[in-house]
Amino acid sequence: MSDAHARSRARLPLRTRTALAAAAGARWASQRTGRGKGSMIGGLIAARIDPSIMQRLAAGKRTAVVTGTNGKSTTTKMTTAALGTLGEVISQADGANMDAGIIATLTLGRTAPYAAIEVDELHVPHVSDAVDPEVLVLLNLSRDQLDRVGEITIIEKRLREGIARHPDMIVVANCDDVLVTSAAYDAQNVVWVAAGGGWANDSISCPRSGEPIIRDGDDWWSSGTDFRRPTPTWWFDDDSIHGPDGFTAPLRLNLPGKANRGNATQAVAAAVAMGAEPTAAVEAVGTVGEVAGRYGVRQVGDHSVRMLLAKNPAGWQEALSMIDPDAAGLVIAVNGQVPDGEDLSWLWDVRF
């Protein structure tokens, strides 16, 4: 145990120290019995012993929270890379984005001054109350796992309410997404990013007035209120990323697709808002490759196979755009298990 870790542990209340010891024991038992790394069970046990443990472990950290329907894991890894130019960063390695996974991550990264935390959309309000993030990154909002999440407009309203409780928090929001814009519109500190919004089927009406959303190229506005697309501070094109004060730099990524250029732009904007040097942040996001199995390339016989993941219509639209039209073949596998949602009716909305 490092001196810094020991000093940090000594400052914690007895209940929290007991919770950490129990979590460590659970991880050890899980690994010894071949049942996995034990991070999740450790997080669950720690939270049961000390319900305030997330808040206690996050205290003193400069934290970026990343959320959205699609791109959370990728953007979190990019944000981690960009913040890494400032110092040590703790983040989930496996995309476990609910309370137990977040607690497990914070447990293992006690001494890191920075945290980049992926958070499920439903959990953002109470997680933000616990970790008090310096930056909240809002990527996109669309239908996802209807048997668990429900109506997306409910998520938008909950996010809006959660943001209102943190007036000092910087919100890095995608102004091309109508629902994200609505969630962030009233925030006091917003950095608007034109990160792309190819899927518009879930935002044909204004979330604030119910009137139609009118679109003209990249611009959009509500016919019933003065609610419209804000002017972005950050944006990207086929070659470069552009930011405030005339900043421009080449944007070279290891990941395919326009959506990932948008993810990278939001990650850079978040890191810069927390003090990163822009050029260094851009170079850092370009180092990100495979993300929890996504985008990885596997050799199968004589073929190189790239793995893509999508779990809703918006995600599939982006994934399909990444497929090489000259590829020798395409295999689509559908998982209808609990972690990814048992309601598969959304597949009918994908233009295969």
Label the predicted regions.
Residues 3-12, 189-314:
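Adenine nucleotide phosphate-binding catalytic loops in nucleotide-utilizing enzymes
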Residues 3-192, 199, 205:
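Phosphate-binding loop of NTP-binding sites
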Residues 27-34, 88, 160, 164-168, ...:
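Generic secondary-structure signature for well-ordered alpha-helical cores
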Residues 38-53, 287-289, 314, 320, ...:
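Short N-terminal or domain-adjacent regulatory/targeting segments
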Residues 68-69, 94, 195, 283, ...:
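Cofactor-binding loop segments of dinucleotide-utilizing enzymes, especially the Rossmann-like FAD-
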Residues 79, 83, 102-106, 264-274, ...:
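Buried hydrophobic packing segments
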Residues 117, 173-175, 262, 307, ...:
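Active-site flanking residues adjacent to catalytic metal/cofactor-binding acidic residues
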Residues 291, 303, 309-352:
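Active-site beta-alpha connecting loops in nucleotide-dependent enzymes
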